[in-house]
Amino acid sequence: MKEKVILAYSGGLDTTAIIPWLKETYNYDVVCVCADCGQEEELDGLEQRALSCGAAKLYIEDITDEFCDNYIVPCVQAHAVYENKYLLGTSMARPLIAKRLVEIARKEGAVAICHGATGKGNDQIRFELTIKALAPDIKIIAPWRDSNWKLQSREDEIEYCRQHGIHLPFSTDCSYSRDRNIWHISHEGLELEDPANEPNYKHLLVLGCTPEEAPDEPEYVTMTFEKGVPKSVNGKAMKVSDIIRELNRLGAKHGIGIIDIVENRVVGMKSRGVYETPGGTILYEAHQQLEELVLDRDTTTFKMDVGNKFAQVVYEGKWETPLREALQAFVEKTQEYVTGEVKFRLYKGNIIKAGTTSPYSLYNESIASFKTGDMYDHHDADGFINLFGLSLKVRAMKKLENEKKNNK
């Protein structure tokens, strides 16, 4: 009986060509695994395609809810944003996909796991760090770094498939390189490879429209959260995945969540991409609006640093690490009172606050009001400012003393 390899399979050109290559190069039985993270129509016809290319079996694993509940929600709660823009759509998904690859490898008794990530990108790191953390005994095959892989271009892969009698049921024309799941869709390549070029949004966008093309009338949306977890949209209770789908629909309609970023990859190079994250952008903003109301200042400022570190850890593929677990434990503690309702309106790419309420609100109108109130005496500020500015006063006094000495 042949040994088995588990292939992370998308059905695209790369992983289609990898199936016969694995059989020829390693004499393995190829078990394909497609992880459904909410990419929907991209899964149509996948099983037939994999088997016709020589795969022994195909698993289509629906991990959408696990992705939303256990990966997206912690990142939203941490307000993890990489380099102030990227909402980690691909970064969050890869560790979960790798985890499922390991689980199926154990089930099938496979000796190796293969992925089609290139040697220039971040995904190779995200896949392999997770596999190493969960299954250090399993061999990892990365064709684009394998000396036996002779296919150096898209044209080479197309010709290789033709020679092996593989029909490619999709366009082989040069197009954007895309990654899609329930959270986002990313676009790279073509005119985006030159940062001097403006994106061709009419050709590029898949989920939504530009702000200029959005409706001329705003749309009001209300969300509720319980302990930092989204629970409803416009009065309708839903599980997290359905909330994201509904926010995607609303956000895409109003031109929300389109970013053009030049980011620093883990491997050292810069890359340029356009991301569509309509629902995610709304969810991050709504959650942050509620936190503004219920978190104290010290927690808020420290949490900003934690969020930046959380984003870096996730971006670098370090999900299965003690540091990510520790950061998440802190974040979860901060979410105890992040419960309430957030109202906002969507208008031409903008999310405009329209009111926030919480039973745990730390906003006290009788203190904050410009009107005179019993709970705050303006004279109390005298002593506070004297103490708060004491170090500045001492420094200034010393400076004057030294200047007088020098002028004598």
Curated annotation (Swiss-Prot):
Residues where L-aspartate binds: T118, N122, D123
Pfam families: Arginosuc_syn_C, Arginosuc_synth
Database matches in SUPFAM superfamilies: Adenine nucleotide alpha hydrolases-like (SSF52402), Argininosuccinate synthetase, C-terminal domain (SSF69864)
CDD domains noted in UniProt: ASS
First and last residue of the signal peptide: none
GO cellular component, as recorded: cytoplasm
Protein name: Argininosuccinate synthase
Organism: Lachnospira eligens (strain ATCC 27750 / DSM 3376 / VPI C15-48 / C15-B4) (Eubacterium eligens)
Protein's gene: argG
